[in-house]
């Protein structure tokens, strides 16, 4: 006697979770595939396949899984963000920027989407444009050094010494190691570091 679909789905989900726990990603992918046989639009299975194939470097498969997931859940900001991250990793900057912008349109407070958009803009040498998402990222994540570091680098590359100095001084208050790295890169000195 075959299990009803909800029980089978639960069973496959549990088996996939155990496989992940024991680092058997190949088997986990098989169980997620079985979940898709029951429901081709299962968001958990699609997201899990996308993440696992991306981690294995199987980018096209991951991208296809994210696309399928977004066909089912078009307003999933996380999926758009992750798709953007994957596209940036594949050097498809315009697609990455579009995905990050879509994530931000859905969730304006998605700090990582702002950061991802900024990194894509920096990679495309669109430094002036990168300032807006960097400033939003540092507002949303004021204690994360990554946005501040990139903001200082962009300000420095744009020749804005005063703004770079302000960011460097701010960063030195809570992340002196990163501030010292910026000192080496910019030639500026943080007023709060000895």
Positions of PLM-derived features:
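Terminal, low-structured helical/coil segments at or just beyond the last alpha-helical repeat
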Residues: 2-9, 156-194
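Structural signature of tandem alpha-helical TPR/SEL1-like repeats
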Residues: 21-33, 55-68, 89-102, 124-136, ...
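Helix-start (N-cap) detector for alpha-helical repeat units in TPR-like alpha-solenoids
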Residues: 8-9, 43-44, 77-78, 111-112, ...
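Alpha-helical segment of the N-proximal tetratricopeptide repeat
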Residues: 8-44, 48-55
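Structural marker of alpha-solenoid helical repeat scaffolds
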Residues: 4, 38, 72, 106, ...
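A generic tandem-repeat structural signature
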Residues: 68-123
